[in-house]
C-alpha cells in the first residue's frame, strides 16, 4: 500500500479471544503529510484505513467522530429463498490492541459543520468547503 509503511496495521480478535495480526504487504509507501476526512458515516473498513493512516503515517484525522463499527463480519451465507445473512465474528483492533467499536475514532482536528454550513452542504466546491479547508490547514501544519 502506498499510504502506510510495511508493518502491523491492525489486529482481529475472534470471539474465542484469538488475536491475529493484519499486515501491509509492501514497503513502497510514499511519505507525505496527510489528512483524512472522517465523519459519522465513516465505518468499518474505512475506520480501519483512517486509523492506519493516523497510527502508521502520522496523518491527521479531520472531521467528526466516526461510526464506531470495528467488527469483523462473516462471509455472506446465502439461503434457498434468496436471502443472505452475515454475522459478527470478531473485533477489529488498532495496532496497539485497542478497539474503536462502539466509540468511533475521535478526529485530531474537529471539522463539524455549523447548522448554516449543513444547509449549504451541496453548494460547496473544493474551494469553499470548510471541512476541506480544515484538512488542508492540518496538512500545512504538519509541513511546518
Locations of the language-model features?
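Soluble periplasmic/extracytoplasmic beta-strand elements of cell-envelope proteins
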Residues: 2, 10-13, 33-39, 52, ...
